[in-house]
Design a protein with these regions (language model features):
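Hydrophobic-face residues of short alpha-helical interaction/recognition segments
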Residues: 108, 161-162
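A structural motif
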Residues: 128-138
């Protein structure tokens, strides 16, 4: 198993910080191979927010109740908010690789909304991108090296990550709308050209396919 992590002030404790709009607390990578299972269970959640990006494999998440299970595949991002139940597992057989980041701040809720991460959603289809992984690795390095103005750099890098997430979410939404528009246009054209025939609902999709 490969692990690479960085923690603000070398502290593993979760915290809430309202002194600044956005504060990164920790960030890391887990890459499972032969390890059978890596579980996390926080019944009362944490004080901060957490983003988990699944780069490969699968994540087994239990939202709201421990008995609920949602399998989240690669190419998705999971968002946990403060004090939400956090129960999830990764399995070596899935060859799972995840990137995670914990953050807090006085304006996090509005920042997330501004980048299209709605309050009632936990899983976001952000796709797979090396750019995501590069940003996570930069954040880890900043936490490990603690160079001048690194806390400000951490906040900027997190915003960068949120922006590229939003761009992909917006692109997916546009592609879906374009697909629906094309399908609707094809259906209207077919009906116009065959208005004098008996048209069965069963054959219509095949004619437009």
């Amino acid at each position: 198993m490969y692990i690479n992590t960085g923690y603000l002030n070398h502290s593993h404790l979760d915290f809430k910080d309202k002194s600044r709009p956005l504060v990164v607390g920790s960030c890391g990578i887990y890459r499972l191979s032969g390890d059978p299972r890596m579980p996390t269970y926080r019944p009362k959640g944490r004080l901060d927010y957490q983003i988990i990006y699944i780069a490969s494999g699968l994540g087994h998440f239990h939202f709201d109740k421990p008995e609920n299970e949602t399998i989240v595949p690669a190419g998705n991002m999971v968002l946990f908010r403060p004090k939400e139940l956090q129960k999830y597992e990764y399995y070596g057989e899935d060859k799972t690789e995840v990137y995670w980041i914990h953050f807090t701040g006085s304006d996090v809720k509005n920042i997330l909304r501004s980048y299209g991460l709605q309050d009632n959603q936990r899983v976001f289809p952000v796709g797979s991108s090396l750019e995501y992984e590069q940003i996570f690795k930069q954040i880890i390095q900043e936490l490990q090296r603690c160079q001048e103005h690194y806390e400000e750099m951490l906040a900027l890098l997190l915003r960068h990550l949120l922006i590229v997430f939003q761009r992909e979410l917006t692109r997916v939404h546009i592609l879906k709308n374009e697909y629906l528009d094309r399908e609707m246009h094809s259906a209207v054209t077919y009906f116009n050209e065959n208005y004098n025939q008996d048209i069965s609902i069963e054959i219509t999709p095949r004619q437009g396919a």
